[in-house]
């Protein structure tokens, strides 16, 4: 493995660890039975770590149902070969979503109540490498 390729792999692993450590994740065994169907229909996304499937808690409402805005965001992001790319998009601050009255970018997962802004940010992201 080349040094550059190894460096990218280490960076990816560090990013995954950061996303897992800083987020609230629930295991496939603690989510509703419909979760596989929801994921297949593009209503939610899941990631795999250490042989287990995990789902970001922010995708669900208080009754453990998928938030409709997640489906819209995933549709705008388009098909991704790597679910960790989707997780990273939700997790890290996005230049197209800023705090009200300020210019500091915020993470899409923290702006899900700002429907138009997060869906627009997903639309703008599609086909790019970042915000």
Predicted ranges, named:
Residues 1-131:
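Non-transmembrane "mature" sequence context
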